[in-house]
Amino acid sequence: MKTFTWTLGVLFFLLVDTGHCRGGQFKIKKINQRRYPRATDGKEEAKKCAYTFLVPEQRITGPICVNTKGQDASTIKDMITRMDLENLKDVLSRQKREIDVLQLVVDVDGNIVNEVKLLRKESRNMNSRVTQLYMQLLHEIIRKRDNSLELSQLENKILNVTTEMLKMATRYRELEVKYASLTDLVNNQSVMITLLEEQCLRIFSRQDTHVSPPLVQVVPQHIPNSQQYTPGLLGGNEIQRDPGYPRDLMPPPDLATSPTKSPFKIPPVTFINEGPFKDCQQAKEAGHSVSGIYMIKPENSNGPMQLWCENSLDPGGWTVIQKRTDGSVNFFRNWENYKKGFGNIDGEYWLGLENIYMLSNQDNYKLLIELEDWSDKKVYAEYSSFRLEPESEFYRLRLGTYQGNAGDSMMWHNGKQFTTLDRDKDMYAGNCAHFHKGGWWYNACAHSNLNGVWYRGGHYRSKHQDGIFWAEYRGGSYSLRAVQMMIKPID
């Protein structure tokens, strides 16, 4: 600033002191940011002296003080100050505006850069999200296409099943019509058969003769290879006598035989005081694995009962409903006895139709029949299911499929009602219980008669086949030595 002031003072001093050059003029050539010369007249250059001063470029940053005399100095001062100040103000204003604009631009550019970065980041995220959504859309389209295919397949299956059901319904209706016609035919034939039977009975009654039931085969078609017959062993033909049995239902006294030793080798009687259990299988599961007398109470029964549980046969848990061992108990009984049961639990006994019905209908049971002949040979017949219908259906027998080595002599009785001497429900014109001397699910009449007369020695002589026989094993003229009927829940 001091240098600039000193320079201006020298300049004005030279302008005032112009004695050796009259009427001369001078021009100051200022070198600024934009340097330009002043044009001079060629004529005057020849007459006048001209001085050119090179002044270093300075920027006026404060007030300028000029001390000079005369009108020319004042004019020059005004010219310099006004022009420079105006120029400086313009420059400063312009630079300030530019600086402000640049500052705004810088700020805006910074914000824009940040926003651009954020937008780029968001763009990348959006692109990734759009890609994910696009992939999900493709998966959904594929899944819906698969679902539509599955739906079409299911619809086709439903249509096929519906068609089959309609066909089955049509066939069922046709079968119903055929069944109704066949039922009418059977009823008509039954009426005709009944009339013919009555006529035959009247004819036979006039002739004072007796109708005997049909006899089963004396020797079975299929005999076990190890079986040996002893036709010479013919014992007496007597039925067991029971002192408490009504005399009017007893057969003649010449049909009895004395008891023999039990072939099943019953151990000393064991009484189990725990319980009651619903069957012998439940007792075995409770830890009782010894054969003996147990207290059993079936579901929905009025009270408990005592019966024999057989655990010696693997795997045990068998409930014995009938047992024949030595002929000590009379099985030629009436309906009430067979309904309630009779005999000795540790020997021969019949559990009772009502008790058997309660047991067999509380669960799904199977039936095992063990047979023993007089040669100590044991065979068995097992049926996959067993149950009785209620008394209103006269304890109708329902059996499953057969397996075993004794032959199937029980299936012929499947679906038949129980018959006793005083309740005839068999398919024969007469009373099968009268001829076979015991209660059973007779057809017309029997292929098995396990409640018949116990004969010693095997083969027996009798007018009717009234022994304990299994037609497919030893035939109808061979009385077995021992029999057990047992049931157990299906595994």
Swiss-Prot record:
Glycosylation sites: N160, N188
A GO MF label: signaling receptor binding
Keywords: Coiled coil, Disulfide bond, Glycoprotein, Secreted, Signal
Annotated tissue distribution: Highly expressed in adrenal gland, placenta, thyroid gland, heart, skeletal muscle and small intestine. Weakly expressed in testis, ovary, colon, pancreas, kidney and stomach.
UniProt main location, coarse: secreted
Keyword Disulfide bond: yes
GO biological process, one term: cell surface receptor protein tyrosine kinase signaling pathway
Domain Fibrinogen C-terminal: from-to ranges: 271-491
A GO CC term attached to the entry: collagen-containing extracellular matrix
Disulfide bonds: C280-C309, C432-C445
Coiled coil (residue ranges): 80-168
InterPro entries: FIB_ANG-like, Fibrinogen-like_C, Fibrinogen_a/b/g_C_1, Fibrinogen_a/b/g_C_dom, Fibrinogen_CS
Localization annotation: Secreted
Pfam families found in the cross-reference section: Fibrinogen_C (PF00147)
Signal peptide: 1-23
NCBIfam families cross-referenced by the UniProt entry: GGGWT_bact
Protein name: Angiopoietin-related protein 1
Protein source organism: Homo sapiens
